[in-house]
Every structure is written in C-alpha cells, then in structure tokens.
A protein has these predicted regions:
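N-terminal beta-strand-loop-alpha-helix module at the start
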Residues: 29
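Active-site core segments that coordinate phosphate-bearing ligands/cofactors
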Residues: 1-24, 32-236, 241-340
Length: 340
C-alpha cells in the first residue's frame, strides 16, 4: 500500500487549505502482482472493439508501466538484482534490500510489481549520437560505392572499440540531444572534444562514444552503488545497445563494476513482461511469489550470457568519468552559445 509516513506528512502540509478530503481518499487502490484487477465489462469491451468481437469477462491483472514490465521481462524482480534498458534513452533499476539513507535528486524511487522498493536512474540520451556517427561512416563507405550492411557496420565499429585505450586516450563525448537532469544540463548539444595530444584513432573514437552512451547513467549509479553502498548480484541488460554480442554488455559491466547478463528473451520488452504478469495472476500456485514464478516456470533457471567486469575496464571507465565531470562546463556552454 502507500507509504503511511508520507501520506501523513502530505496531509499535515495541506491542513490549512481546508480541503474536504484526505489524500488517501482520492488515490486509487493499490494492487500488487497476482491480485485480480477485475474483469472487462460489456461497456469496456465495446469501447475497445466496436465490432463486438472482443468479449466481456476477460480477467484483468494490475497494470504496470515500462518499469514494472521491464523488470518482469528480464526476471529482475528479486532483491539485489536489476536491469538496464539501453536504447534511445537509458534507465537502470535496482531492487533494494533496505531504504536509501538519503534523498538524491538523481534517483527516482519506484517499486517492483510485487511492491519491493526500487531505485531508478533515468537518462534522456543513450544511443542517438552513437547511431548518428555510425550513419556517417555508412555515408563515407557509400561515397566509395560500397554498400554496407548496417548490422555488420555496427558490429565492426563496436568491436573496434574494444581495441581502444581503457580511458579513451584523451577523447570525450557528450551525447546530449536533450538536457540531462542527472548532470544539471537543461539543454543538450552533442559534443565531441579531444586534447591536442590525445590518442585519436578509430578504436578510441568508438570507445568514447560507447562510454558516452552510458556516462550519465554511470554518474547516477555511482551515487547508488558507491555512496549508498547498495549491493547488486547481477544486472540484466536489454535494448539496442546490447545487440552486438559482448560489447555494450562489457562496457555496462565496467560502468557498474557488476556482472551483466543478457538473455535472448530480453528483446521482447514491455508487452511480453505485461503478458507474464497476467499469466502469473492466472496460473500462480498458492503462496508462490512472482520471483519464484518467473525463475522456475518462465525462465527455467536460464540466467543468460553473463559477463563479469574487467578490473582494467572498470578503472578506465572511472578515469573517463572523472575527466567527463571536469569538462561538463563545456557541454553547458555549448548549449548556451548555440541557441536552437
């Protein structure tokens, strides 16, 4: 149910307004995974399907947004597990053992479908800038009359990044197509910058843009993992960044200093996760938790392909982030001096 302490604090804050209600009276009822949310009515069926083919009486489970369905789709509903969805935007969710010690504006608090507390880091930008650079390389190849398969091009360039310096050799990139609240950037301007003596080569160029795709996420996660000392046994990755086997997965493992698993089913996404939650409501055994149902009946013990963090990669990403933070003013100044 709702946090009673927060409910009481809110009601106390509005005491002088003389509203004819208490906040809990106007909030919807809380339902957790496995509970019944009712059945589809005749009126509802007609609204959804005026043709009349959709029948009333269909059982409904509690609805979830992208966060809850993503947790179900990646089997990351247990304490000390989490998932990272990396595509146009990127977010990470970690299921907590206990409440955080402090309030952090970089972190959002949500719950699993079963009601366990989850810390979330959400960033507006991830692969858009990276994709734009890959598109530029395709244009270069086409200028020589070479038709390049995009999947092959992504694979070649991503794997080339693995040959780069662990700290990207003096290159930095900010992938901000839009602002990033985590770093206090109100607007975004994609930016690539390097030192005059940087090791400027293709491997470092690709590595810095892969780092940039996860850099803001890492800043938020460092608060969670290093300041709050939250423990994570395993993270499940899903989304476009992980399509090239072992590359995005390894870089995320370095960013978090934690094992990262990628399952073949991870690409199924939210709709499949919602279907799993509906299936749990209908098929769960007495006393069977969502965690048990997913692990035993859906995923069957399958943990996916797991990559452990490489200590050298972890140290390299940490060094990159130190330089990234120090130069953040250049990104903010670019937004100020290049109005849209």
């Amino acid at each position: 149910d709702y946090d009673e302490e927060m409910i009481e604090k809110f009601d106390k804050l509005i005491e002088g307004e003389n509203y004819p209600w208490k906040v809990k009276e106007i909030m919807p009822k809380v339902l957790v995974a496995g509970e019944s949310a009712g059945t589809l009515t005749e009126e509802g069926a007609k609204l959804l399907d005026p043709s009349g083919n959709l029948e009333a009486g269909i059982p409904l489970c509690p609805p979830e947004g992208d966060a809850g369905t993503g947790m179900a789709a990646t089997n990351s509903v247990a304490v000390r597990t989490g998932n990272v969805s990396a595509g146009t935007s990127v977010f990470a969710m970690v299921v907590l053992e206990e409440d955080l010690k402090a309030v952090h504006e970089e972190l959002d608090m949500v719950t699993t479908p079963s009601g366990d507390t989850v810390a979330m880091v959400h960033c507006n930008n991830c692969t858009s800038d990276l994709n734009a650079w890959v598109g530029l390389f395709r244009e270069f190849a086409e200028n020589f009359g070479i038709n390049v398969d995009m999947n092959e091009l992504f694979g070649k360039l991503y794997n080339k990044a693995l040959e780069g310096d662990k700290d990207c050799g003096g290159l930095l990139a900010y992938n901000y197509f839009s602002g990033e609240p985590v770093t206090g950037a109100n607007e975004g301007r994609p930016l690539f910058v390097r030192k005059p003596d940087a090791h400027f080569n293709l491997a470092n160029f690709m590595r810095t843009h892969l780092y940039a795709a996860l850099a803001t996420l890492k800043i938020g996660l460092d608060i969670l993992l290093k300041e709050e000392k939250v423990k994570v046994d395993r993270i499940y990755g899903h989304g476009g960044l992980f399509k090239t086997k072992g590359v995005g997965q390894g870089i995320l493992a370095a960013a978090m200093d934690a094992p990262v698993a990628v399952m073949e089913t991870a690409g199924e996404g939210g709709p499949w996760g919602m279907a799993l939650l509906a299936s749990y409501m209908l098929q769960k055994a007495d006393g069977e938790s969502l965690e048990q149902y997913l692990s035993e009946k859906v995923f069957g013990g399958e943990s996916g392909s797991v990559m452990e963090p490489d200590p050298a990669d972890v140290a390299g990403f940490d060094a990159y982030i130190k330089a990234y933070k120090a130069a953040l003013a250049t990104e903010k100044e670019a937004a100020r001096t290049m109005p849209l």
